Amino acid sequence: SCDLLDTDIPGMHYQGDVRDLIFASEANWDMVIAFPPCTHLAVSGARYFAYKMELQQSSIDLFMMIANMDCPEIAIENPVGIMSTKWRKPDQIIQPWQFGHPESKKTCLWLKGLPLLKPTNILPFPECGYWNNQTPSGQNKLPPSPQRAMLRGITYQGIADAMADQWG
């Protein structure tokens, strides 16, 4: 794994900028599964796009740097956002409830050399009319906080397991 932040789980982890790894002279990638920051790409922040145009371009550049890597298999995960118009539509849109989690979070996958991710445990729509992470009106339950972006960006274990099992 690679992130600017510490890892939450044991295992190999590079704490730093992914560009350092992409441009390493000895880099020879078999597969890349990337989760670039969505803060400036997701449609949930659309009302701020004019204000953060420069930051948005930096995020687009990082996304495209990953997409254009010399690697036979690439998956890029991000929520519904501007990359569908800035680059191309995603190959697939998945939901946590397709992988055993009673939540809703539309997640786009842009794929190169990889098959579509097959759902592993599709849950029925709740009788109450909304998923565990939603209010009755369908909004996300998390209140504003310094941790909100990190908590909303967590990868669901069922999706991570499906990626490892099907692509690994």
Task: Locate predicted features.
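Conserved active-site and SAM-binding loop architecture
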Residues: 1-168
